[in-house]
Amino acid sequence: MSTIESVLKETRSFPPSEAFRQQATVSGMQAYNDLCEKANADYEGFWADLARELLSWKKPFTQVFDGSQAPFFKWFADGQLNVSYNCLDRHLEHNANKTAIIYETDDGQVTPISYRSLYEQVCQFANGLKSLGVGKGDRVVIYMPMVPQAIVAMQACARIGAIHSVVFGGFSAGALRDRIQDAAAKVVITANESVRGGKLVPLKATVDEALAMDGCDSIEKVVVLQRTYTPCSMGARDITWDALTAGQPLECEPEWMSAEDPLFILYTSGSTGKPKGIQHSSAGYLLGAANSFRWAFDYKPNDIYWCTADVGWITGHSYICYGPLAMGATQVVFEGIPTYPDAGRFWRMIEQHKVNIFYTAPTAIRSLIKLGADLPKQFDLSSLRVLGTVGEPINPEAWMWYYEVVGGGRCPIVDTWWQTETGSAMIAPMPGAVATKPGSCTLPLPGIMADIVDESGAQVEPGRGGFLVIKKPFPSLVRTIWNDPDRFKKTYFPEEFNGQYYLAGDSANRDESGYFWIMGRIDDVLNVSGHRLGTMEIESALVANPLVAEAAVVGKPHDVKGEAVVAFVVLKGIRPEGDEAKKVAAELKSWVAHEIGKIAQPDDIRFGENLPKTRSGKIMRRLLRSIAKGEEITQDTSTLENPQILDQLQEIA
């Protein structure tokens, strides 16, 4: 495998303002460097100090790290704690009346929930689960809308030592069945339906369909939240949320867990092949989530924080359910979508709730640019202090719009690189210390030993692309793949790298300043005439064109070049057809050739009103690869937000 070439040239840099730097918890590069040096000098001591500072222990640990069974690492293994206790109980003495959650429904109703109220709801539901026979080590599948009860269910599982597996509410019955079967779950928690963008989406009916398939015999009970007035089928196996919690005590003694006991399994999305059950620990995971929340967002106790993710994904686990609550934060939880009832919804909510820290996905940013690039200017967004992005690399042009239009040039952009498997942010600017660059996730957080290597495991020189690895195990790292340790080793600690480094599966390069630039997944790397090009860079070039709102690039086999470049493009205006489409396609091909070079010029350009995305906003690139190759689509498309656009994307301009 030859070295991946980096062709994206981005030179803009934005240091923290003096005003921001002065109020920041980690202020200035010297403070950042001091933390990094502390981690380098005494790696175990660095993490042990953080674990003692940020977590409350029932039984303090004496052993920090155990690598004797590498790559099955252990952290704080002889310590005991409870994750729910760390997120709720410990705040009650001084902050019982502090708002934990500001919940806004799809139709705009707002309900504040205090830490005391959240604690009582979690205890009641935990007692309800215990009454169903759920206990330590049992698996519970949660298939819920984005409502506070989803967080209650997760925290209740953590409280009694049950292992939760949240399945995103957009997954099909087949995908749900696969996860129930792999986890051998005992209980499913769901709702009659969810409400998204004014539309009702049945959930209980999907659960019933999944449980009617082979392989779900482990399920004993289904708990159903009545989210709307729509009735749903209720059999002998089913019980309503209200019936389960009625009369349950408002206190529930936490189950004290070993630091290494599993907290949850989260299956990586079905759009990336056979689901892998990513298993996270209790203490190490919580430490990563809480500390990175504090550092990456410069969190202050009076902040109003809003992450727009769904709890069905790792971002919703780490930066809604666990990290913010462990730190005692107040956060907005939103049931709806950014474009309902109109494209001003996010900005209106930021104004109304006086949000200080806003964390969303580049996909949402790009779609909001398309729907109204000037809309944010109609709202008072002066409360914002930090803007974050997550889920995929952000194109420099989208970054600049986010920075200038949403943040008014005041707010650092915290572009966070991390994964389901890492549990918490790995590479991200500490906003009071690190200058940001559009499109770069900047520098590793202190204690994260990230590097870029070639296929032999040797470090590559600046400006050359390679494989992103993390050279030392860290507390929030995935512990194994549920029931598949061999796959865990082969996937993340492959023999080619002597089994030593965590292989992220992303290609990246590092510039002369040490900044990391994610170029895309290793399988999103194109080999065009012997040149390895990251799809991210071609997409960035396309999006830099004033006509283009969004672009996704994939490869398809080519007799001469090895791979041809196929671009799927959404324009800011209406979708072109016929001669107009040919004209715009020719213009965009010339544009890319000018921006990057002829080598990266797309062979085919196809226009759609949108790109095929899962309901969490991820572009389904495997689907695009099938379309590009002219293959029949065999992938599960049940998580697609917009299946009707597939026909448009078959047409070559």
From Swiss-Prot:
The keyword Glycosyltransferase does not apply. It comes from the Bacteria. Keywords: Acetylation, ATP-binding, Ligase, Magnesium, Metal-binding, Nucleotide-binding. GO terms for molecular function: acetate-CoA ligase activity; AMP binding; ATP binding; metal ion binding. Mg(2+) binds at residues 543, 548. PROSITE patterns: AMP_BINDING. InterPro entries: Ac_CoA_lig, ACAS_N, AMP-bd_C, AMP-bd_C_sf, AMP-binding_CS, AMP-dep_synth/lig_dom, ANL_N_sf. It catalyses: acetate + ATP + CoA = acetyl-CoA + AMP + diphosphate. It holds the Pfam family AMP-binding_C. Its EC number is 6.2.1.1. GO terms for cellular component: cytosol. Acetylated. Deacetylation by the SIR2-homolog deacetylase activates the enzyme. The modification N6-acetyllysine is found at residue 618. GO terms for biological process: acetyl-CoA biosynthetic process from acetate. Its cofactor is Mg(2+). ATP binds at residues 391-393, 415-420, 506, 521, 532. CoA binds at residues 196-199, 315, 529. Belongs to the ATP-dependent AMP-binding enzyme family. Catalyzes the conversion of acetate into acetyl-CoA (AcCoA), an essential intermediate at the junction of anabolic and catabolic pathways. AcsA undergoes a two-step reaction. In the first half reaction, AcsA combines acetate with ATP to form acetyl-adenylate (AcAMP) intermediate. In the second half reaction, it can then transfer the acetyl group from AcAMP to the sulfhydryl group of CoA, forming the product AcCoA. HAMAP family: Ac_CoA_synth. PANTHER family: ACETYL-COENZYME A SYNTHETASE (PTHR24095), ACETYL-COENZYME A SYNTHETASE 1 (PTHR24095:SF14). This is Acetyl-coenzyme A synthetase. It comes from Laribacter hongkongensis (strain HLHK9).
